[in-house]
Amino acid sequence: MRKGLQNLQTEEEKANAQYKILAVDDEEGIIDSLSIFLKRSGYNFTGVTDPLEAIEKVKTEHFDMLILDFIMTPLHGDQVVEEIRKFNKELYILLLTGHKDLAPPLETIRRLDIQGYCEKS
């Protein structure tokens, strides 16, 4: 293999690199898994375990997507979204949930204009 070939990015990775994704989950393992997957796919990824830090990051930096856990401390995902929607109505949000009863997350999705959800298993 020629030198430098391993450094070539696919067209998809180049396209993905322009997207900034922020994830917040109080489980470090989830952040680590998302980091590995999204960075390998070429995305510009930032992960945090503190919901308050996530709110501050969205205030001070541009992100194209927020992936967040539904149940966290000190704030639940719905509280994080309520705060973010006060100053950023355009951010695409994906809610992660390990909730067995999907009624609370689905009600939150409708109420807070969250674009999607994904179940943790």
Predicted segments, located by residue:
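Non-catalytic signal-transmission and effector/linker regions of two-component phosphorelay proteins
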Residues: 1-20
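Acidic catalytic/metal-coordinating carboxylates
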Residues: 19, 49-53, 75-80
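Two-component/phosphorelay signaling modules centered on CheY-like receiver
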Residues: 28-46
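Acidic, metal-coordinating helix/loop segments flanking the phosphotransfer/catalytic sites
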Residues: 47-65
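Conserved phosphotransfer cores of two-component systems
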Residues: 59-61, 84-90, 111-112
